Amino acid sequence: MGNDTIANMITSVRNANLGKEETVRVPATNINRSIGKILLQEGFVKNLGELREGTNHFMILTLKYRGRKREPYITTLRRISKPGLRLYYNYKKIPKVLGGMGVVIPSTSCGTMTDREARQKQIGGEILCYVW
């Protein structure tokens, strides 16, 4: 049985948000890098960096907060397609989160992208996670 690196990343980010941590360190896999780039592009994280410790590669996400109470920009980060139950959608049926306010991250044949990009390019794929 393998590790679900996407679920590990999502759980690490969610826990860091709850603890109001400034940064979170996750394993740097190709899929985690692409999800991190989407989170940066959509404004959910401040910065994205990489760290190498020996043979291990890590990605450092700098989380974004707003106001004096430090409310996190990421209120919910949810894994959808899991190793035991993969969910694939046609581009017409990719769900909208919060009426388009949230982001759905599908993995397509052209790489990982946002739901808006997938609809624009008319490409369906496996729905990895929801972010809002």
Swiss-Prot record:
GO terms for molecular function: rRNA binding; structural constituent of ribosome. This is Small ribosomal subunit protein uS8c. Keywords: Chloroplast, Plastid, Ribonucleoprotein, Ribosomal protein, RNA-binding, rRNA-binding. GO terms for biological process: translation. It is found in: Plastid, Chloroplast. Part of the 30S ribosomal subunit. Belongs to the universal ribosomal protein uS8 family. One of its GO terms (cellular component) is chloroplast. It comes from the Eukaryota. The keyword Iron does not apply. One of the primary rRNA binding proteins, it binds directly to 16S rRNA central domain where it helps coordinate assembly of the platform of the 30S subunit. Gene3D superfamilies: 3.30.1370.30, 3.30.1490.10.
